[in-house]
Amino acid sequence: MGMEPNARKPGIMRYERQKGRGMPPLKQTTKPVIYFAPMEGITDGIFRRVHHELFGGADVYCLPFHKLTQSMSLLTREIRDISPEENEGMNVLPQALTRDPEQLSAWLYYVSECGYSCADLNLGCPSPTVTRRGRGSGMLRDPDELRFFLDRLFANTLPVSLSVKTRIGYESAEEWPGIAEILAGYPFAHVTIHVRTTREQYTGGIHPEAFELALQKRIPHPVYNGDLRTTEDVNNLLARCPAAEAVMIGRGFLADPALGRRIRGGEAAGKDELRAWYTALYEGWKDRFQGTIALGRIKKLMEWPCEGDIKKKRLLRRADTIESCIHAAIGE
């Protein structure tokens, strides 16, 4: 089956309302609540379904952001990704990228029509193609403009709860106290804080003290994000910040799909389980897309467990079948 074209539909599609979907379970007693961060081109509905069924451990799966346009149309893959059928039985959190409060408000009504009760605003994407247009973490450059945007957005009652994902500044972490003060003044369902600046992208040191400040500022339900790769990383965070309720994990989950389960005291993934994981993903992607696309996605995903291992990375580059990819990643 060929890949569906990413043509934009002439207007937002509607789905039958199904109440009670997608509300992040922040009031649960098991700490921390674990959010699975999105990775465009990998964590689609097939990925989420297979991960949920084989490993679990993620309380909420965050969807790749919808880049909102003036026409309020969505790509075919975006419509499919947010559909209730694609996310049956899972808590998911739709996310939007925009600098226009009217666009966001209209999109939130669409999210409500899909049956979801919470959605997320992306103020964290550091990609230059996004930030140069004043979207994503580009909105952090001008605190006055950010406040004006949020004032207009919250001037009316929203149809669903709204959360936000942010960075701690654009140029410097010294910007964070002012940004935190702004965010604390609005009724967000939760605030996910990636403890790096836009300039730092995804490399270099992190600033966990920024999360501590968020707790002091009483930002609504702060969620920690940034370099949580192992159970030790999560345990160290909780020891440093006992009041932390929730974490968001991205690259750590890609390298170790059982990480959420292990954080809760479960077992690490064995080789048979990993083999089943990669095989199920490949078969699912192959059914939806072309075989070459499916293999490309598998190889992109496997870059994370192969990170730092020169031999595995060399084998993965040469692999041209799912069997040779699995051999490269898990050694069999």
Give the residues covered by each predicted segment.
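Flavin-dependent oxidoreductase catalytic cores
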Residues: P10, Y15-E332
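Methionine residue identity
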Residues: M1-M3, M13
